[in-house]
UniProtKB/Swiss-Prot annotation:
CDP binds at residues 97-102, 193-196. This is Riboflavin kinase. Belongs to the archaeal riboflavin kinase family. Keywords: Flavoprotein, FMN, Kinase, Magnesium, Metal-binding, Nucleotide-binding, Transferase. InterPro entries: RibK_CTP-dep, Riboflavin_kinase_archaeal, Riboflavin_kinase_CTP-dep, Riboflavin_kinase_dom_sf, WH-like_DNA-bd_sf, WH_DNA-bd_sf. Pathway: Cofactor biosynthesis; FMN biosynthesis; FMN from riboflavin (CTP route): step 1/1. One of its GO terms (molecular function) is nucleotide binding. Signal peptide: none annotated. Its EC number is 2.7.1.161.
Amino acid sequence: MKLKTLLLLIDLGKRGAIGGKITITLREISKELDVSPQTTLRWLEELEELGYIEKEESRRGTSVMITEKGIRLLEKLYEDISIALYSGVIVGEVISGIGEGAYYVRQYAPFIREYLGFDPYPGTLNVKVIFPKTIFDALCTSRPIIIPGFKKNGRTFGDVRAYRIKIDGIEGAIVIPSRTVHPPKIAEVIAPVNLRKTLNLQDGDKVRIKVL
């Protein structure tokens, strides 16, 4: 199938042609896709011949519905695009934190050692996510390691979700506390070393994080 024909199928889905018929005109579709009405008609006929849509002509326009075969194609396309976009890679920009990372890493250090297998440097590297939209998009296919909460000196420390990562060859983890003040655009990274010093990072530097 040609890319333009596939784009037409996607456009029909966006217009609501899944689960029921919609009425369209060649003029509005051709304007959306920046092609002639004749080309739009030819693409509709191709989709119909391939079994991806059903269509009927009337005085009001063309009634179109995406078939089950067409829906399966769109679902497969969505899965492939999701894998391509959210393959566990985060591209971000180094930023300064609010200064609390060192304290909390020290409190959780014994549990980080137990559950992640390394002694963490007392501090976090904060990364503002550029791609994908949020850290959750990059982590959606990964299973977290749950570091359980605990009480210490009358204070309660909540659970932490940890995701193993590698940044410029150094293994570490993205940590997401159950009680976080950071928005989903900020990734907190811990590692056995001072990442800023080891990788010579400054605020504004771009980094690439691979989720393991």
